[in-house]
Amino acid sequence: MTELNAGNAASFRDQVRAALVEAQNNIDIDLSQVEFVDSAGLGSLVALRKTACERNGKVRLINPSPHVQQILELTRLHRVFEIVRL
């Protein structure tokens, strides 16, 4: 996926939630191929963080592209999510 936007954000969120097994607390999301994210995409990431927090877990955003990293910083979400560079 190269974009996380209003057209696919709800589907993305639902697919990630469906893939979670009961004992899984943490969610790792590879953003290395995502070049664009809008407010709906950010909302889906925040919703997944809420899901993880309800399980006493966290969301890690893996290798966000420079543009996505900039959006995370502009929205201050880089303070909410753990950003991991591998």
Question: Where in the sequence are the language-model features?
Answer:
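Hydrophobic helix-cap positions at the C-terminus of alpha-helices
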Residues: A19, L48-A52
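C-terminal structural segments of small proteins and small subunits
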Residues: T51-R85
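Short, glycine-/small-residue-enriched flexible loop/hinge segments at domain edges that mediate gating
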Residues: R17-D38
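STAS-typified acidic loop motif
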Residues: M1-D14
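Residue-level recognition of specific faces of alpha-helices
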Residues: Q33-F36, S44-A47, Q70-E73, V80
